[in-house]
Amino acid sequence: MIYTWVNKVIRQNIRKRVEEIFAFSEAPIETQEQLLRGLISKAQNTTYGQLHHFEHISDREIFSKLVPLSSYATLKPYIEKMRDGQTDILWPGKIEWFAKSSGTTSGVSKYLPVSKESIEECHFSGGRFELALYCNAVPETKIFEGLGLRLGGSTQIQQEGKGQSGDLSAILIQNIPLWAELRSAPSHETALLSDWEEKLEAIIDEAITQNITSLWGVSSWFLVLFKKVLERTGKSNLLEVWPNLELFAHGGVNFAPYEQQFRELMPGTQVTFMENYNASEGFFAVQDDPSIDGMLLLLNNGIYYEFIPLDTFNGTASKTLLLEDVELDTDYAIVITTNGGLWRYILGDTVKFVSKKPFRVKVSGRTEHFINAFGEEVIVTDAEYALQATCEAMECRVIDFHAAPCYMNNETTGAHQWLIEFEQAPADLEAFKIALDLNLQSQNSDYQAKRKYDLVLELPRIIAAERGLFHQWLKEKGKLGGQNKVPRLSNNRSLIEQFLALNASLQTQP
């Protein structure tokens, strides 16, 4: 009886969500204007609202004049007050939850405020939009006759200051509504296990006998789970384990390197692949048409958007564009204002618009060079810190370096490959590798999580480059001198393959 009630509630919600999608697609600018007015009105009596004269803001242009662009570094003093239990700082009331996320240059981790509104009206709302879009596209779906298997990150919640902090997935599990929990796997108890290896085995114990009809999570984590499921069951693909599986909703990392493996694990056309774009800061977009390489920007999901052309990006001194002023196939840094208290916050991601009617985007990169092939979010400053600390400890010196991902396949786990040109090489390259790995883990908690038990990432693979490699590469590119430099991180292998080929040719020279 209770499952019949749950399914009825879900279907009613889906109809409402589909209507909302059509509404904001027809009036995107008006939707964003109305949303911004609501955010300003809600927060005008906060410390931040009073400081920046929210009471005088009547439109988007005045908003961009009175409120400065922000980064985590500029908002950190306010966030620290919120973590100390102070109220009405960036957002009304007391913030109980903080999503812990790596990627800043100001410390190991950043703590992003997660308000009640952002949980319900952004993160959960985004998931409901995705489900609604799928059901609207597949009206004969039987997805509600089974369970949705969700796979989050670490679920360790810590009491820090006057608030609770942890991975966003842990926060969402703690706040999941009853109707969603009843249609989800694994059980609440299993989802809250703090030990990842133990949790993975427990998920498999439960899920292999359940009617799983949908999968929700980061593709690199699921690849680990799927391999273990097939090992445990002896089946050749996932449809032999879950014959009614029909949806794989994925996000968090670049899916392209994994797609072929997933197609082999879920053969045929039975399973629909839907990409979503979300982060600790919010739920931004979802693929509304599987045939289109782009995601529908959610314009009434608690987030107001601005955009900075990447070729003019200058941090918090940048000039922004309104939604209606963007152009197709141009890289933009995203600026968000959210119902979690992030005001004109430079997210760090870059997107390209693939259509404007409706507004669809695809993630194109980061405002800095980075590696995020497995959800580790390693930026240049992380890598430089780890390398510097390792060199100091092992009395060696580096001229330059480049690192890129080695993707998972059926035989190997993922890894980072580092090509390092030494001025003075370490006496023991194996010890250097271990030290570099530990230093990077100490700097970046997301990398540390992916390294745990070698499930997603194994030890980095270090190659000592030939002397003069990077100078020669710059010379061949006509980029010697001036501000030209070697890109130190890449999220794909195109650049490192160039370096490796050139390195091999240098090895053959006398």
What residue ranges belong to the model's regions?
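Active-site diphosphate/adenylate-binding microenvironment
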Residues: 30, 34-98, 110-111, 121, ...
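Conserved helicase ATPase motor motifs in RecA-like P-loop NTPase domains
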Residues: 99-105
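Short, basic alpha-helical nucleic acid-contact segments in DNA-binding proteins
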Residues: 126-131, 291
